[in-house]
């Protein structure tokens, strides 16, 4: 990455406090147009707090933030119109049908009825869900719900999509297939900002930042980080950065462990 790259997210000195607790402590970074940017760290590191601020859902305590060309303080609605968002729970309503979910989110994103109908047809054909059009979301396998949720999140063709722990709760094979969808979106020019605590997934990103206790401890390409810390994989990079000795790792509470593909 270099200065000629167009920035789509600029964050300077972001702070988010809850009382005296700093969930985000002076974060500064840039995300470039068209890249897959990994926002990594253990559970509780501050990733979800930051992503909700970048999406315009929460107000920061302080700092300068520009997303998709818009100021997060004064142009929140413009930010929301130019981004997509998918959470770990897949952002779908389980008590309505596949088509009703597509229609609902298309309306939220401001698409016309004609656009919704056309894109719904294209989406269901691409995902091979044409025969599931009128099925409740709750009846679909978890992997299919995940695919549909991501497709709905980019239904309006946003400049940028935020994926907050999108592969949580699914098996390793399904996670790998989901990343194929992410690559396809990136190939269409959509910037992908993904948070995860699966360090294996860092290998799929163009660049990654690693959060520790509300701060960005390091940021670079996966290969550069592995070279810098002289290790073979991103899990070992995380352990080095977090200053956790390997023999102490198994003593951590489960929520702080970095999960690995089996």
Region spans (language model):
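Conserved ABC ATPase "signature" region
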Residues: 103, 107, 114-132
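ABC ATPase "signature
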Residues: 219-220
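Conserved ABC ATPase signature
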Residues: 95, 136-143
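Catalytic Walker B motif of ABC-type/P-loop ATPase nucleotide-binding domains
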Residues: 161-165
């Amino acid at each position: 990455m270099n200065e000629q790259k167009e920035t789509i997210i600029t964050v300077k000195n972001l702070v988010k406090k809850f009382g005296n607790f700093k969930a985000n402590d002076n974060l500064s970074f840039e995300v470039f147009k068209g890249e897959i940017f990994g926002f990594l760290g253990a559970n509780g590191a501050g990733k979800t707090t930051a992503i909700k601020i970048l999406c315009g859902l929460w107000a920061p305590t302080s700092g300068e933030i520009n997303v998709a060309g818009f100021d997060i303080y004064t142009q929140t609605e413009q930010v929301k119109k130019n981004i997509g968002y998918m959470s770990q729970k897949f952002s779908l309503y389980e008590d309505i049908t596949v088509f009703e979910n597509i229609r609902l989110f298309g309306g939220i994103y401001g698409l016309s009825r004609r656009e919704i109908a056309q894109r719904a047809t294209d989406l269901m054909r691409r995902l091979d869900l044409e025969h599931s059009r009128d099925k409740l979301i709750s009846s679909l396998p978890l992997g299919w719900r995940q695919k549909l949720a991501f497709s709905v999140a980019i239904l309006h063709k946003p400049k940028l999509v935020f994926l907050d722990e999108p592969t949580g709760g699914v098996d390793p094979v399904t996670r790998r297939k989901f990343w194929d969808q992410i690559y396809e979106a990136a190939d269409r020019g959509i910037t992908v900002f993904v948070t995860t605590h699966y360090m294996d997934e860092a290998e799929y990103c163009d660049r990654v930042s690693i959060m520790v206790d509300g701060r960005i401890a390091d940021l670079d390409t996966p290969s550069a980080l592995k070279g810098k810390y002289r290790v073979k994989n991103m899990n070992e990079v995380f352990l080095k950065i977090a200053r956790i000795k390997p023999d102490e790792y198994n003593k951590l509470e489960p929520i702080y462990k970095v999960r690995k593909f089996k």
